[in-house]
Amino acid sequence: RHMDMSMKGNLKGRHSIDDAQVLNLPNQHGSPAQLRVVPETMDMKMTMLGAMYAPNDEITFLAMAMQHETSMRLNTYGAMSRTLLGSFTSRSEGLGDTTLGALLAGGDVTQKYLNGTWHYGLALSIPTGSIQQTGRVLTPMNQQISGKRLPYPMQLGSGTYDFKPSLTFNSAAHGEWRYGGQVSGVVRLDDNSQGYRLGDKTNVQGWVSRRLAAFASASIRLDASYQDQLRGADSAITLPVPTAQTDFTGGELANLSVGFNFVGQHGIWAGHRLALEWTSAIHQKANGVQMEFQDTLTLGYQKAW
């Protein structure tokens, strides 16, 4: 599965703000006293390779590895003024965190208006992604510096072991229609080696799909999530930019997605599945100032034996 996510501009709470408003905000690192670097755009590409194995109908084991590629474009302003000194791009790339877990059958539901099956998931995220990514930055003193520790969103992993439980319901077919829902979470089990932990996360989502043909279906999905603020701090992340402020982390996010799913039926195509989904943010309430989510495009391929 491959995902391409874009962000553009900045929000304070629910409202868009410009560079001039960001420059009025205090810098928790002290020098300079106010923020002087403002993110403009961010593009994150994630490629996930997963495998699942079901020895019986009651349990399915899963494993997933992830490759990250992130780039962020930023403007730098003078330390003693609001003069625009220039722009620069930060990049990070490498292996993300690895997930191992299992899906366990929970049984059937046969109510009048709720007919289907549910299962629960238990997974552990292993901190294989780097949290010490560095890059070249333009400082408010108008200096190009290499080897500077990049802010939290540019790191490749959480640095912690994370517990990832989930509960999922999938309906039986109602004519051409199906529906489902899921509640899931991420619980950080400890602080990482750099002295912080990302916020715990809760997600709720629901979907409806309709069969278009024997091999194709379309779906609409709505998801909402809440993430706590980051706790602790990495003493090496000190750039006067919103993404380096620990109070400016976490918040609310809701997305609306439209997708198409194609499943091979016969011959060499049997067992092959191709999925395409476009996601757009419809609500975001950031803690402090954060970048504004835009769109995500996901392309997935699956082969079943």
Predicted segments with their positions:
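Residues on the lipid-exposed face of transmembrane beta-strands in outer-membrane beta-barrel proteins
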Residues: 49-53, 63, 100-106, 122, ...
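Outer membrane beta-barrel transmembrane domains
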Residues: 15-23, 27-29, 191-305
